[in-house]
Amino acid sequence: LARPQSTDNWENTTTEGIDIVMAMDISSSMLAQDLKPNRLEAAKDVAAAFVNGRPNDNIGLVVFSGESFTQCPLTTDHTVLLNLFKDIQSGMIEDGTAVGLGLANAVSRIKDSQAKSKVIILLTDGSNNMGEIAPVTAAEIAKTFGIRVYTIGVGTQGEAPYPFQTAFGVQYQNVKVEIDEKTLNE
């Protein structure tokens, strides 16, 4: 009679991914509701879907408004990264939109990577109004390190509800909203 046996089979697989840093605008202009529920939440949803579709890549997250900081360094632990997306909100740091500073911070996070491909994905409404580094300058720095920069414009042109804090709480008014496509294309 054959006796029952069990075996432990181990399989090592090697996958080769790329390194990606997502740079996300969290300025107050991202609270405009031309996208639902607002620009920031729409950008977070797009970013989370992107992360879920890239299981073999190292992905990091930089956030910026008037200043910039690293929310998550490059990691393959996408569960941690996705949880950190939930914590992102406008008002975490000084307001304004320093696109160049956010892009430069993303470059510093990925420039020393040994990956075969290095990519920065910039999610913003593109209206740069702060920072010591111009967006085009930061993009040129990325290019010198062999880093490709892809931009995702978040928003529409026209008018949209925008939240204002009043003595009676938050009220919404229609304001002119735009997306700076010229800067994003450069």
Predicted regions, residues:
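Residues immediately flanking
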Residues: 26, 125-126
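Conserved beta-strand elements of the Class I
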Residues: 21-23, 121, 150
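Membrane-embedded segments
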Residues: 3-117, 133
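VWA/integrin I-like adhesion module and closely mimicked acidic/polar interface patches used
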Residues: 94, 119, 126-185
